[in-house]
Structures are given as structure tokens and as C-alpha cells.
Curated annotation (Swiss-Prot):
Its biological purpose: Participates actively in the response to hyperosmotic and heat shock by preventing the aggregation of stress-denatured proteins and by disaggregating proteins, also in an autonomous, DnaK-independent fashion. Unfolded proteins bind initially to DnaJ; upon interaction with the DnaJ-bound protein, DnaK hydrolyzes its bound ATP, resulting in the formation of a stable complex. GrpE releases ADP from DnaK; ATP binding to DnaK triggers the release of the substrate protein, thus completing the reaction cycle.
Requisite cofactors: Zn(2+)
Assembly mode: Homodimer.
Keyword Zinc-finger: yes
Binding site for Zn(2+) 2: 166, 169, 188, 191
Each CXXCXGXG motif repeat, start to end: 149-156, 166-173, 188-195, 202-209
GO biological process annotation, one example: chaperone cofactor-dependent protein refolding
Residues given in the record as Zn(2+) 1 binding sites: 149, 152, 202, 205
Annotated organism of origin: Rhizobium etli (strain ATCC 51251 / DSM 11541 / JCM 21823 / NBRC 15573 / CFN 42)
Cofactor-binding details, from the entry: Binds 2 Zn(2+) ions per monomer.
HAMAP family: DnaJ (MF_01152)
Name this protein carries in UniProt: Chaperone protein DnaJ
Length: 375
């Protein structure tokens, strides 16, 4: 029976990136996990296929070989004499070992003793408000991830049993094979470099040493955090295999755009429209700030559009500092609309009695323009 295409098994396109692969795998693994489907042979078969597909496609080298050669890349003897297939030596291991030894390099990628591997790092995207960035917060998040199996404590072996040293490589995880004029040391095809085999797999994790589960975590968001900041939670990523160290969880923060404020570092900017008469005659208005207080802004007579007023210390806190940015009020002057007859008459009268001193900028601008073009 022909093996299913790995991409079809995970339900992703061949162009899928690492994030899409991982997302598809988690979704399917949770759906077909044996714990959720007891005594369901079909679900167990699909679960194994999903694991196999993800294990191959998450490794860039294995994925490249599969994209080029298909399942033939992993069949026994696929190297024409090397034996063992891709997962047990294959293209990358042979090439890495040949060139590594010739160039004085090391052995290529290896697992530690007993097959222990560090768990994968995880990414979590979190969106917060500007108010939350101002005051800081403790957020509760739920992260689907692989955790150490509580039945076998990560060994992968059935309780009461132990993994055994691989008889093929004598527990080293590496074997030597003749390859033309070279003696090549490559990954053991029996234990896949772990150095151990599991005769009696754990019934819960099926020998993986890890299970997929959703965890609840508390994340401290410090006051003054900026958009695009990355927070690292050490050891909160996926559990390692066979007792290996866990990966890290990275929280990528984005701050929602605010209705009134724009942020530039620790400073805030707020555009405030005022009436034409307030700009001409002067006045005051109150501005609500992010610290929950109100600040009064005094507008002097003759204030022009674009004028900025600085409210010292009313901006954002500087991360891990006692300093605080400023709030800048940017004045916009609103031109009156839908005038009544009386309002129009008053404005026309005002225009008639106005002098150059009332509008020095516009008067001077047009005078300079006329002189420039007419000489």
C-alpha cells in the first residue's frame, strides 16, 4: 500500500512554513490522540502518520530530501550501499560526516546520550492596549505544547521497564560503514542516534516521552513595554525528549493603536481640534491622561494650527526606569461649517474690518509670492 503524502497527511501546502506545519500538527495530534480516542485503531493509525509526517517535514534537510525524492529518500538502502535510509544516516549524515572529517569539523548533528534532545522553542503572539502598556499587567495565557509525560516521567518506557542500549551501535548512537574509500561514521539506523531502544513503550505517550497538552501560564508585562517587544520565558517551551531540557517560550507583543494617542518612544502625541474663536480669543480645555488624571491646557490668543503644548511627565513610563516621557498636545483649528445667515454676516463683517496685522502670515505669504513671480 502506497504511503500517504506527508503534506496531505498534515493538510498543508508544500509551501507551508515552520509555523504552519507546527499549527497543523498540534491541531491534528490533539484530535487523534489515543487518550481522546481509546480503542480506536483508525485514530491510532492516523496519530502515528501525523507524527511521522511532522518529524520529517520539520527538519529542513529531511524535508528537502523528501521534496526531491519523495518516500524513496527514506527507504532502506536508498543510498545505494549505505543502507539505513535518511532517518538513519541518509543523505545529510553521510555528506556531513565526509566533509566534516575532511575539513576538520565535528560529527554533524547528534543527540546527547540516551537520545535526550532539547525541546523546541515556541512563539505566542499577544496584543495589549496602550493603557496596559502604560501601567503593566500580569496576563494569563493558554499555550498548547508538548510536556513531559507524567506516566513515564519522560523516559518513553512503560512504568516498571527501562529503555535498553541499542544492540546495533552498543549505545553510542553511531555506526561505521564503508563508503568507497572512506570509513563513514553515521547515525545508527536502529535507534536513530538515541543509543537506546524502548522494547515496552509507555501506553500514554507511545514511547515519545512527551504528550500534547494546553498549559496555563502567567506572563508579567512590565510598565512601559513597547510594540514589537519579545519576552522570553526560559524553559516554558516544548518539553525535551527522553528527559532533555525544555525549549523556551517567546511572547511577541503588539500594542493596539489608540483612539486618541500616538506613541513615539516614551512620548505621547494627541491632536486636539479647537474652534476658530478659541484659537483667536484664547481659552482652556482639559485632556484626560493615561494615568487617570486630567490636565488643563491654556490656549493663548492667536494660537495657530500646528502649535504644540508640552505636558511634562504625562507620557509613557520608560521601561525599567523611574523616568517618564511627555505628552504633546497638537492644536488643530476647526473651520466652522453649515453657517447660519447671521453667522455668515458676522464673518463677512469681520473680514471687512480686518487688517494685515490680524493675519500676518497669510498676508506676508501672498505678498512674497507675488514679488517672486512678477519681480
Amino acid at each position: 500500500m502506497a504511503k500517504a503524502d506527508f503534506y496531505e497527511t498534515l493538510g498543508v501546502a508544500k509551501s507551508a512554513d515552520e509555523k504552519e506545519l507546527k499549527s497543523a500538527f498540534r491541531k491534528l495530534a490533539m484530535k487523534y490522540h489515543p487518550d481522546k480516542n481509546p480503542d480506536d485503531k483508525e485514530a491510532e493509525r492516523k496519530f502515528k502518520e501525523i507524527n511521522e509526517a511532522y518529524e520529517m517535514l520539520k527538519d529542513p534537510q529531511k524535508r528537502a530530501a523528501y521534496d526531491r525524492y519523495g518516500h524513496a529518500a527514506f527507504e532502506h538502502g536508498g543510498m545505494g550501499g549505505g543502507g539505513g535510509g535518511f532517518a538513519g544516516g541518509g543523505f545529510s549524515d553521510i555528506f556531513e560526516d565526509i566533509f566534516g572529517e575532511m575539513m576538520g569539523g565535528g560529527r554533524g548533528r547528534q543527540r546527547s546520550a540516551g537520545g535526550r534532545e532539547r525541546g523546541a522553542d515556541l512563539r505566542y503572539n499577544m496584543e495589549i492596549t496602550l493603557e496596559e502598556a502604560f501601567s503593566g499587567k500580569t496576563a494569563q495565557i493558554r499555550v498548547p505544547t508538548s510536556i513531559t509525560c507524567d506516566v513515564c516521567s519522560g523516559s518513553g518506557a512503560k512504568p516498571g521497564t527501562q529503555p535498553k542500549n541499542c544492540g546495533t551501535c552498543q549505545g553510542t548512537g553511531r555506526v561505521r560503514a564503508a563508503q568507497g574509500f572512506f570509513s563513514i561514521e553515521r547515525t545508527c539506523p536502529t535507534c536513530h542516534g538515541r543509543g537506546q531502544i524502548i522494547p515496552d513503550p509507555c501506553p500514554k505517550c507511545h514511547g515519545q516521552g512527551r504528550v500534547t497538552e494546553e498549559r496555563s501560564l502567567s506572563v508579567n508585562i512590565p510598565a512601559g513595554i513597547e510594540d514589537g517587544t519579545r519576552i522570553r520565558l526560559q524553559g516554558e517551551g516544548e518539553a525535551g525528549t527522553r528527559g532533555g531540557p525544555a525549549g523556551d517560550l517567546y511572547i511577541f507583543l503588539s500594542v493596539k493603536p489608540h483612539e486618541f494617542y500616538q506613541r513615539d518612544g516614551a512620548d505621547l502625541y494627541c491632536a486636539v481640534p479647537i474652534s476658530m474663536t478659541t484659537a483667536a480669543l484664547g481659552g482652556t480645555f482639559d485632556v484626560a491622561t493615561l494615568d487617570g488624571t486630567k490636565s488643563r491646557v491654556s490656549v493663548p490668543e492667536g494660537t495657530q494650527a500646528g502649535k504644540q503644548f508640552r505636558l511634562k511627565g504625562k507620557g509613557m513610563p520608560v521601561l525599567r526606569s523611574a523616568q517618564t516621557g511627555d505628552l504633546y498636545i497638537q492644536i488643530q483649528i476647526e473651520t466652522p461649517q453649515k453657517l447660519t445667515k447671521r453667522q455668515r454676516e458676522l464673518l463677512q463683517e469681520f473680514e471687512q474690518i480686518s487688517s494685515k496685522e490680524n493675519n500676518p502670515e497669510s498676508t506676508g505669504f501672498f505678498a512674497r509670492m507675488k514679488e517672486f513671480f512678477e519681480g
